[in-house]
Amino acid sequence: MKKTLSVAISATLPVMAGYLILGFGFGIIMKANGFSTALAAAMSIFIYAGSMQYVAIGLMTGGASLVTTALTTLTVNIRHLFYGVSMLDKYKNAGSAKPYLIFALTDETYSLVCGELPHIPQEEKPRYQLLVSVLNHIYWITGSVVGAVAGGILQCNSKGIDIALTALFLTVFSDQWLTN
C-alpha cells in the first residue's frame, strides 16, 4: 500500500501543479462573478469537470435555459463516454470504488490510469487507480477553494485564466505520448 501510494503521488505531481493553478483560477473567476466560496467548493466536489465548470460560470451569469445547459454539458463532456467505455476492462476489479472511479475520470486522470502500469503489481492496480483519482480530485477541490477565498480577499483581473485548462491537458497528453 505504501509503495502504491508513493507511486500514485509521484505520478500525480504534474496534475497537482496544474489542478491547483486551474482550480485557483476557477475559484477567482467564481468570486469575480459574485458566486460564493461554498458554490465553488460544491461544484468542484460534485461536478468535478474543469472545462464544464468554467463554462458553467458563463451559463449561470448569462441566464442560460435548462435545455441550453444540458446540451452544452453533453457537448463539452461527450469525450467522457469514450473514456468510460475504454476503462470498463481496467475497472472490472474495482469493486465498490467503481462508481467513484467512473465519476472521477477526468482527462488527466485518464492519461495516468489508462496506460500500462508495469511498476504496480496486478493486485495493487485497483488501489493505484483509486489513489490517483482521489488525489487529483483533492487537488482540484483545494485549488478551487483557495482560489475562491483569495478571490474574495484580492481584487484582480481574471481575464485569460480559463486558457490554462487547455494548456494543462496538452502538457499531460504530450508527456504521456513521449513516455509511452
Predicted region positions:
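Hydrophobic alpha-helical segments embedded in the membrane of multi-pass proteins
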Residues: 21, 142-145, 160-173
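Alpha-helical transmembrane segments and their membrane-interface exit regions
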Residues: 48-52, 75-82, 167-174
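Membrane-embedded alpha-helical segments in integral membrane proteins
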Residues: 22-30, 53, 140-148
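Helix-loop-helix hairpins and the membrane-proximal interhelical loops
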Residues: 1-47, 58-67, 71, 155
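Transmembrane alpha-helix boundary and packing residues in multipass membrane permease domains
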Residues: 24-28, 57, 85, 148, ...
